[in-house]
Every structure is written in structure tokens, then in C-alpha cells.
């Protein structure tokens, strides 16, 4: 039936900050839903706390609220905006849980708001493990044997019936949070305890093991008329036991017989009917026993998910857009498939004539203490997808798109002749880790058979055969050498997905030599279109992937084109903020009449949506792949400064190959990154940097360190997200760092900087045009002291404590730097402001990045200035004056950005903040005062306000003076103080009464016992030096485990304590209302 006319306003809840298990795929689905519903004439209200999303742009919905996603705040928005319906299926687990809370607290009933897209009962039945199991039994589908436990005793009792290994899955959590696999009683007690604490309903499912079974997912869409289509069948290369978000997955499914496929198809449709999902997309996961063929249903998600984003990109069928329209009453046969230009209806099941492989990207290098074994709890931070005509081609393209330094199935570096290394290899095959695929390659190099590898890994023999064949192709080529490379052989190897770089490695030459030979032999890729119908109908949509065949379907135009290189897979330090900038560049330049070409390989993002740009190449971001596209399309300009470090690393090589890089020149980018050249510029401009030196070997480092004095910040040059950066407090620390970390630098030296203690860090984003005019986008004052990575620090716009004179000085310096570097486009600068003995502010320049930075979306939302769009137009040749963007906007309200961390996912990782970036996402809070804005941001970040009770204070000596006002404020608020001996004596001397408690090393009962007993409600704990950090580690870890609010910097504690009075108060404002104030 046609769309409903009784609904006028629809509220969409977004997914909040990016966390492990819930990344930018929900920005993609939410943005699509907003577009789809507004196209149908509905008024759309959106709430999402994450400013780095496209969906929170003011033009995406009629009212956009960047507010905390909890039922109390959403109730205020409902009261104000009076929506008729709430669509909760676009914002992942966060939105579903919030919708259930609103229903349970009677808010939906009170304001007469209807849930569309998924009914309350359907969400309940799908999410509640016990209800789901019963429902499956009623329709004759098998689930793994399991029972629900609400206490540890119940869990131990159930275990006796299901046996070890036991799988534990908490209800209503995201990405398998708190779950795991227990092989013995001790592990069971640990995992169940954690699971019960993380589950909002305090229940866990204790389930029989189906480890080693094959895992499949079906993406299903169903409408009110009971039309059902399977958009895509996805097969996990990794067997059951690895969370599907951490598995390598392949579409379409490769190893199902036709009969098995029909069985899964019928079963998944039966599941949707039983659960009652009648308008939209769901994903159903199955396990199949490789020995008996028994099929079990693992779970279903009654919403758009990570897998549906993958299925949408893999097939070209926009699941979220279709699901949004079904939610307002359309049926599938009434909707047109856009990718075929409307030639087919949406009820036409997609069929694909290529293979898609997704490989997850991990960040264990950021969390050395974490357990890198993959289990049922998701640990990856991003993913990459590749398409090819065969599984081998798409697998190898995906491997080089991961950007982990691999260029194919690279050897792991094990000595395959040694017994110890072979034993290690077998362990790696058995216990899955992030590198398992490379160990599979090594197993075949060592002469193991497919049967041997299967017995250890349970990866289906079909996949193992494919990988074995790739290894034998490698070995033959290495034996034959370059002379044997004629056109037929090279074409065969390229069809199997080998990169030029990997071929060069195998025959002992360089990538350029292989490229020259390949071009001479006329072995070039062609581009095929993704059309959702296996080329049955012509498609007008230019959504392309490369392969080595005969017919090219690219058909490039001769319009003026600009190509934007995306950021590749999400990782810590390079996330959705960079994708946001790429999307803005594409939208702005398209409006200006350019044909826009996007190159990217991340399936979760808005940039890889086929209608964000005019042409989309879904390709790895390597020099080889980019050069081939440039050659075919001949763009007027290529933008490399928007995708983070990924495209920047290619800038020099692209320029050397004659590619027109627009914006800031690769030479200026290099000048800003090269320490010695940059030092000269700073001296010439008369600016100050912290005293620094460059050391090229270990001994030199120790000598130079004495010249500067400790503490020092040490790091390798050319890194993003502060990789391998550390603060060292003495010689033994530095010696250890130089011994362990210099391996990081590729023939590049280590940088030593004097660490500025107790300085305030400031970020400034600016745009410069080709005439050298500069627009200041925003000045942000960090809340945590210098020394915490800027991506991990909270910040405030406008600054909340810096004097007007200091701010003017910062602006003056930034303008000089932009001119000195000849910046065209965006530039981000970081300063530290330190008070000298005379009480004056001294400004030190920390670093300059002549590219888009991760603060661009936040600044754009806070000031209403679309910085990435303005800068893209500057790069394409427009001036700031022509765009009417010449004056800085300083709002009279405060916006605070707060970072979100994944520490709860990684047992054993210390949650202390430092110079290495470890946050995965961000939230934003707005208020009339700094305290109010900070309180909103804390609430949005899920950081709970400590209830009255005992506050524990333990700080390093230099912080004792500064912690006094914080301690006083706590006492005035009604908290009682608890402190360790040193800090306690200091507080008592200054007239504050406090209870003294033992440090862990001083014997029991000590502070950690108090935390475990629930006696402590808030913790302020600062430390310096490695020894003190590791002594106090258990305090921070237990705080995290027992959900006690804690601060690891004095400035953070001060802001938190002063913001307590604002918690939960104040009205809600939409961005549209805030930005209107700025125009006045």
C-alpha cells in the first residue's frame, strides 16, 4: 500500500559515538533514512550525540539534536518536537535500547508516539535470549542448547548440562560485549561475572559450544504485505567462535549446496515472520555442523546492522533507504531500484557476478596488554572490503587495502625449518588471532596439506584450497624469476589478485619495474559496474571495481573532474571524522559543477555510498590502484588532504607520477612533517617550540636527552594518532624506549621534545585560499593537560579559561604559519600555553598538520561553518571572499567535545591517558556555560555522575597544590575524602579532613579492596613515571570494572566536579536554533 499520510513528524535515534561493535555503518544507515523520509515529505527530527557524523549535519533533518541518547533527554525532545512516530532501527543497539526504555517508562504512550520499523514485542523477542530460543522452538528451528542465568550459581548449574567449552552471551549488549568462551570453571566465573555486570537486564545465556562450525548470515528485507527478499547471503571464512564482526566474510556464500541455501533462505524468512519484523531489514545468523549438517539459528538483529551496511555495498541494494520507506507503509514492489535507474522494482532480489571479501582491521598495537585472541566479543575497530571476479582476487585486494603494511599473503617471518616456530605456527592456526590468514599461508609454504590445516583451523577446505593455490603460484614465480613474466602469465597472476608490489618482492625487483613491464605488455585492469542484477539490465550508476578481463564498463566522461581519496579502513587515530570531510568535499564540488570521483575501500562509510559522488571506485588506496584510475579518468585535480594519513602517504609518489595534487603542495606537507625543515621555518617566523632534538641511534638519544632535561616526549617521525609515543621521566625509561621502539621507524630517527608540565593545550583549525587569505574556523582549549593526545582530550569551543590576549597571540601565529607553509585548504595547529614564573602566558608551537584534522566536524557543528566544504572550494580555486566566508564565528554558547574509549572491551589494559591515542569516537555537549556544556558531554559519553559518598584522591607531588580546590569543592558538595598517606597528609595540613587508606603495595585492606566493596564513588588519581603508573594500575582497572567514575588528570577532575550541579538540567536546543542565533 502507498505511504501513510497520518504521520507528519518522524523521530530517528542515531547510534551515538563510535565504539567497537558500532561504527560508522550507522551514520550511513541513518543518513540514508533521513534522506529517504524527507524525500517522501515527512518532517524528520534526529537525535545523535556524535558530531562527527553526516546525519547530524543541519541540512540532513528538519531538527537535529546533538544531545545524549538516554530516555530522559529524548523525552525532552519528544515533548518539544511532538513527533508522531519513532524509527528506532537505524541507530544500532543504542537506539533499540533507548526506544525500549522510552516505551517502558511510558514516554511513548504519554506523548502518543508510535514505534515504526520494529514493534516493541519484536525487539524484545529478538534481543531477549530466552524469548528468542522459545520462539525458534515453536517454529521448529534448532538453536544451540542453552539456558538463561541471572546469577553465577545458576550459570554454574547450567554449565553441567551443556559441557565445556561453554559460550556466554549477555542480553542487550553490543558487539558481544561481556561475552566469551570458557574452557574451565575459573574462566566461566570470570566471564559470567563480567557479563552480568554489563547486561542491562543482568542476564546471560549459557550455551553449548558450536566452535568450528561454519557460520552464515542472511540479510533479509520484509514488508507489510509479507513480501520477503534475501538481499545477500554472507559466509564467514572464520568458523563459529569468532564474532562475525571480527571474521573475514565473503559474499555471496561460496560453499553452500543449492539445497542448503534454500534451507537457510526458508528458515530466515520464517524467523522474520515469527519475530514480527514486518517493515525493514534484519540479519539472521546460522551455524552449520560440517560433520552432521545440523543447522542452528545463532541470533537475529531486528534492525539495520554492520552486516546490512556490508550487504548494501556488496550488492548496490540500499537496505537502510528501503527499510525507512517500508516503515512508513510502502511495499517492496512499489519501490524502484535506483541503481538500475528504476528499471527493476525493489522486490527484485539482487544477484551478483563478482565476489566480495571483507577483512576486519584491528588495533592491538595500541593495547599491548590486551588479549589478541578472537572470541565471541568483538575487538576489531574497522574493516575493508574488496571486489573481484574470483575469491582469490577479492581476497588479495582486501589484504592490500587493510594498510597494515601487508601487500598480499606476506610470510609471517617465522623460520619454517625450526621446530619451535612450527609449534608456534600450529598454535596460531588453532587459536584465531588477527593474523591467522598469514599463518595459513605459511602453513602451505611449510608443506602442510589442506587436511592438516583444516584439522587445526576448521576453515572450510574450499577456502584453504584457494589459498594453497595462491601460495603455489607465488612459489613457482619465485623459482622462475622475472624473465618468465610474459603477458599470459602476468595476466593470470593479476587475475588472482597479486599486487605489483608483491610480484616485485617475489622476483627480487621493485614495484616500478613491474609496473613498467606490465604496461609494456599491455596488461591493464578494466572496471566493471555494481548493478545488483549481474549485468541483466544496463545501469546508469557509476559504481565500479577493477578486474583483469577484456571489456571495460567505466565509460569515463570528458567533464571537469576532481578525485577525492578516502581514508580506507577505520582505525584508532583515523576514523569517521576524515570520512566526514571527504563526503563534504564531494558534495560541495558536485554543487560547483565538477564531476566528483571517490576512491575508497571502507564499506561502513557514507563516502562509499553510490550517490555521494558522481563516480565511486571501490578500490584499495595503494599507489598502483590509484594510478590506474587516474590514468583512465584524467581528473583535473586530486585531493589527498582529507582522508587522514592514508592518501597523504601517497602524495609524493602521486606527484612524481604526474598526478595533479590540488590544495597544499606535497612539498609543504613534507615541510610540516620533516622536523629539521620545519625547525628552520619556525626560527624564521620567530616562533617558540619546546626544546627538542633528533636522535638517530640509542646512544645519541641518551646524550641529547641530558641537554634538554627530563621529562621528555619521545616519538618516531611521521605517525598518526601518536603511535609509539611516550612520556619518559628518566634515563632508564628512555633506554628501554629506544631499545623497544626504534624498530618502529623505517630508517627514520626518533624525536625528543621537552615535555611541558601543567601546560594548557590548544587546537586551532583554519582555512587558507590561493591568495593567502586565512579564515579561523575555531580555537579549542583542551581540558586535559598537554601530554594527553589531542584526540583523547576533551576540548571546549570557545576557550573557557584563556585570556583574550593569549587567544589573539594564537591567532596571529596561526596566520603566519599558514602563509609560511603556503597552505591552500585546511590546516590544524596545536599549541601549548604555559605560565612562566612572572605569571605570563608563554605560547609554544607543538605541531602543524596541513590537512583536515579530526576536529573539523566538531568545529563545523559548533560554529555552523561547513569548514570541509569551504576548504574544498578553496582547493578547487575559489577564494574565501567569493564564498562569503571571511570572518571567524565565535558562539556565545559553549560546545564541549569528549572522547570515548574502548577500555571495557580489553581486559588488562590500563585506562590512563597519555600521548598515544586510544579513543575510538567522540560526543558533543552544548550549554550556556562551560560547566553546563561539559556536563552534557559527560552525560552523552555515558560517564555517570558520582552519587554522594567517599571520593578517593591520590595525586603525584607536582599536582598536590592544584588538587586542593578540587578536594575543597568535593567536600562542599557533601562528599567525604579518602586519600593515600602522602596526599592525605597534604590535605589535612590544609584543613581538609580525610580518611587514610593503604596503597596496594602497603598491605590490606587497601584502596582496591574498598573499590571492590563498593565503598568508593569517585576517584582522582594522577601518576608519573612507569613504576608509579604500574603500581596504581589496579585502581583504575577496578574502577572501570565496577563502573566507578574516575579522572586521571587534575584538570579533568576539576571540570567534572564543577559540572556536577548542571547534570540532567537545562533545555534541549537543535543545531538549527543554535545556528540561527549566530546569524543574528
UniProtKB/Swiss-Prot annotation:
Binding site for Mn(2+) 1: 285, 299
Name of this protein: Carbamoyl phosphate synthase large chain
Gene that encodes it: carB
Pathway(s) per entry: Amino-acid biosynthesis; L-arginine biosynthesis; carbamoyl phosphate from bicarbonate: step 1/1; Pyrimidine metabolism; UMP biosynthesis via de novo pathway; (S)-dihydroorotate from bicarbonate: step 1/3
Gene Ontology terms describing biological process: 'de novo' UMP biosynthetic process; glutamine metabolic process; L-arginine biosynthetic process
Sites where the protein binds Mg(2+) 1: 285, 299
Residues that bind Mn(2+) 2: 299, 301
GO MF, one annotated term: ATP binding
Phylogenetic placement of the source organism: Bacteria, Pseudomonadati, Pseudomonadota, Gammaproteobacteria, Lysobacterales
Subunit-level organization: Composed of two chains; the small (or glutamine) chain promotes the hydrolysis of glutamine to ammonia, which is used by the large (or ammonia) chain to synthesize carbamoyl phosphate. Tetramer of heterodimers (alpha,beta)4.
Amino acid at each position: 500500500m502507498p505511504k501513510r499520510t497520518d504521520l507528519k513528524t518522524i523521530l530517528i535515534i542515531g547510534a551515538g559515538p563510535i565504539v567497537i561493535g558500532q561504527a560508522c555503518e550507522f551514520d550511513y544507515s541513518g543518513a540514508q533514512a533521513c534522506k529517504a523520509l524527507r524525500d517522501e515529505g515527512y518532517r524528520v527530527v534526529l537525535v545523535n550525540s556524535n558530531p562527527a557524523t553526516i546525519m547530524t549535519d543541519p541540512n540532513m533533518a528538519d531538527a537535529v539534536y546533538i544531545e545524549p541518547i538516554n530516555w530522559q533527554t529524548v523525552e525532552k525532545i519528544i515533548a518539544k518536537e511532538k513527533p508522531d512516530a519513532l524509527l528506532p532501527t537505524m541507530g544500532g543497539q543504542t537506539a533499540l535500547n533507548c526506544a525500549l526504555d522510552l516505551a517502558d517508562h511510558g514516554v511513548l504512550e504519554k506523548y502518543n508516539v508510535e514505534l515504526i520499523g520494529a514493534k516493541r514485542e519484536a525487539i524484545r523477542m529478538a534481543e531477549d535470549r530466552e524469548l528468542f530460543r522459545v520462539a525458534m522452538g515453536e517454529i521448529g528451528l534448532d538453536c544451540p542448547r542453552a539456558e538463561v542465568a541471572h546469577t553465577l550459581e545458576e550459570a554454574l548449574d547450567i554449565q553441567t548440562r551443556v559441557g565445556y567449552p561453554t559460550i556466554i552471551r549477555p542480553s542487550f549488549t553490543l558487539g558481544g560485549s561481556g561475552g566469551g568462551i570458557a574452557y574451565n570453571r575459573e574462566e566461566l566465573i570470570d566471564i559470567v561475572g563480567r557479563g552480568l555486570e554489563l547486561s542491562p537486564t543482568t542476564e546471560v545465556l549459557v550455551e553449548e559450544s558450536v566452535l568450528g562450525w561454519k557460520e552464515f548470515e542472511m540479510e533479509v528485507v520484509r514488508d507489510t504485505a509479507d513480501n520477503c527478499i534475501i538481499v545477500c547471503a554472507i559466509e564467514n571464512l572464520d568458523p563459529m567462535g569468532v564474532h562475525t564482526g571480527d571474521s573475514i566474510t565473503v559474499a555471496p556464500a561460496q560453499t553452500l549446496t543449492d539445497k542448503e541455501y534454500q534451507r537457510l533462505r526458508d528458515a530466515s524468512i520464517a524467523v522474520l515472520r515469527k519475530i514480527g519484523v514486518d517493515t525493514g531489514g534484519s540479519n539472521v545468523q546460522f551455524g552449520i555442523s560440517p560433520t552432521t549438517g545440523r543447522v542452528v539459528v545463532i541470533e537475529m538483529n531486528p534492525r539495520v546492522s554492520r552486516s546490512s551496511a556490508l550487504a548494501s555495498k556488496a550488492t548496490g541494494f540500499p537496505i537502510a533507504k528501503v527499510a525507512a520507506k517500508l516503515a512508513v507503509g510502502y511495499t517492496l514492489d512499489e519501490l524502484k531500484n535506483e541503481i538500475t535507474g528504476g528499471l527493476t522494482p525493489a522486490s527484485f532480489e539482487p544477484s551478483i557476478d563478482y565476489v566480495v571479501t571483507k577483512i576486519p582491521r584491528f588495533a592491538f598495537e595500541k593495547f599491548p596488554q590486551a588479549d589478541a585472541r578472537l572470541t565471541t566479543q568483538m575487538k576489531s575497530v574497522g574493516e575493508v572490503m574488496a571486489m573481484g571476479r574470483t575469491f582469490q582476487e577479492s581476497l588479495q585486494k582486501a589484504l592490500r587495502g587493510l594498510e597494515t603494511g601487508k601487500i598480499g599473503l606476506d610470510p609471517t617471518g617465522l623460520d619454517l625449518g625450526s621446530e619451535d616456530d612450527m609449534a608456534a605456527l600450529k598454535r596460531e592456526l588453532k587459536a584465531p588471532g588477527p593474523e591467522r590468514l598469514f599463518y595459513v599461508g605459511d602453513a602451505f609454504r611449510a608443506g602442510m596439506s589442506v587436511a592438516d590445516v583444516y584439522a587445526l583451523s576448521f576453515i572450510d577446505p574450499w577456502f584453504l584450497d584457494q589459498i594453497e593455490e595462491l601460495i603455489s603460484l607465488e612459489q613457482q614465480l619465485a623459482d622462475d624469476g622475472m624473465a618468465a613474466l610474459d603477458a599470459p602469465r602476468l595476466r593470470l597472476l593479476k587475475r588472482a589478485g597479486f599486487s605489483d608490489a608483491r610480484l616485485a618482492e617475489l622476483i627480487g625487483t621493485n614495484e616500478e619495474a613491474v609496473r613498467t613491464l606490465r604496461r609494456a605488455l599491455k596488461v591493464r585492469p578494466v572496471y566493471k559496474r555494481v548493478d545488483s542484477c549481474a549485468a541483466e539490465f544496463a545501469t546508469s550508476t557509476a559504481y565500479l571495481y577493477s578486474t583483469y578481463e577484456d571489456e571495460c564498463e567505466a565509460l569515463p566522461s570528458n567533464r571537469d573532474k576532481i578525485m577525492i581519496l578516502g581514508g580506507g579502513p577505520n582505525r584508532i587515530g583515523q576514523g569517521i571524522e576524515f570520512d566526514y570531510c571527504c563526503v563534504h568535499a564531494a558534495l560541495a564540488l558536485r554543487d560547483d559543477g565538477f564531476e566528483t570521483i571517490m576512491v575508497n575501500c571502507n564499506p561502513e562509510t557514507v563516502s562509499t555510498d553510490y550517490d555521494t559522488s558522481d563516480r565511486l571506485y571501490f578500490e584499495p588506496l595503494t599507489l598502483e590502484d590509484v594510478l590506474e584510475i587516474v590514468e583512465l579518468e584524467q581528473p583535473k585535480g586530486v585531493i589527498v588532504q582529507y582522508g587522514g594519513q592514508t592518501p597523504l602517504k601517497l602524495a609524493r609518489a602521486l606527484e612524481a607520477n604526474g598526478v595533479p595534487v590540488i590544495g597544499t603542495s606535497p612539498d609543504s606537507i613534507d615541510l610540516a612533517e620533516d622536523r629539521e625543515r620545519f625547525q628552520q621555518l619556525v626560527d624564521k617566523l620567530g616562533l617558540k617550540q619546546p626544546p627538542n632534538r633528533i636522535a638517530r641511534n640509542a646512544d645519541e638519544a641518551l646524550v641529547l636527552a641530558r641537554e634538554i632535561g627530563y621529562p621528555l616526549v619521545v616519538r618516531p617521525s611521521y605517525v598518526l594518532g601518536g603511535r609509539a609515543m611516550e612520556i619518559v621521566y628518566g634515563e632508564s625509561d628512555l633506554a628501554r624506549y629506544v631499545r623497544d621502539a626504534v624498530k618502529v621507524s623505517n630508517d627514520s630517527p626518533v624525536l625528543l621534545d621537552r615535555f611541558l608540565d601543567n601546560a594548557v593545550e590548544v587546537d586551532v583549525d583554519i582555512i587558507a585560499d590561493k591568495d593567502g587569505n586565512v579564515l579561523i574556523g575555531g580555537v579549542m582549549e583542551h581540558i586535559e593537560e598537554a601530554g594527553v593526545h589531542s584526540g583523547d582530550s576533551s576540548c571546549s569551543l570557545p576557550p573557557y579559561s584563556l585570556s583574550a590576549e593569549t587567544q589573539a597571540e594564537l591567532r596571529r601565529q596561526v596566520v603566519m604559519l599558514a602563509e609560511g607553509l603556503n597552505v591552500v585548504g585546511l590546516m590544524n595547529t596545536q599549541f601549548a600555553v604555559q605560565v612562566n614564573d612572572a605569571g605570563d602566558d608563554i605560547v609554544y608551537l607543538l605541531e602543524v598538520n596541513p590537512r583536515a584534522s579530526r576536529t573539523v566536524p566538531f568545529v563545523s557543528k559548533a560554529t555552523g561553518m561547513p569548514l570541509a566544504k569551504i576548504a574544498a572550494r578553496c582547493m578547487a580555486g575559489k577564494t574565501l571572499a567569493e564564498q562569503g566566508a571571511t570572518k571567524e564565528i565565535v558562539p556565545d554558547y559553549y560546545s564541549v567535545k569528549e572522547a570515548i574509549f574502548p577500555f571495557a572491551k580489553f581486559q588488562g589494559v590500563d585506562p590512563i591517558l597519555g600521548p598515544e591515542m586510544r579513543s575510538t569516537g567522540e560526543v558533543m555537549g552544548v550549554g550556556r556555560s562551560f560547566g553546563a556544556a561539559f556536563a552534557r558531554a559527560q552525560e552523552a559519553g555515558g560517564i555517570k555522575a558520582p552519587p554522594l559518598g567517599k571520593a578517593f584522591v591520590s595525586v603525584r607531588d607536582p599536582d598536590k597544590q592544584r588538587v586542593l580546590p578540587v578536594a575543597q569543592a568535593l567536600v562542599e558538595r557533601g562528599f567525604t575524602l579518602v586519600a593515600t598517606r602522602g596526599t592525605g597528609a597534604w590535605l589535612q595540613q590544609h584543613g581538609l579532613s580525610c580518611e587514610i587508606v593503604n596503597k596496594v603495595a602497603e598491605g590490606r585492606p587497601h584502596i582496591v579492596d574498598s573499590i571492590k566493596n563498593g565503598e568508593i564513588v569517585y576517584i582522582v588519581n594522577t601518576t608519573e613515571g612507569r613504576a608509579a603508573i604500574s603500581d596504581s594500575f589496579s585502581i583504575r582497572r577496578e574502577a572501570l570494572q565496577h563502573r566507578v567514575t574516575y579522572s586521571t588528570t587534575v584538570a579533568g577532575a576539576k571540570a567534572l566536579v564543577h559540572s556536577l550541579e548542571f547534570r540532567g538540567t537545562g533545555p534541549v536546543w537543535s543545531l538549527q536554533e543554535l545556528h540561527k542565533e549566530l546569524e543574528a
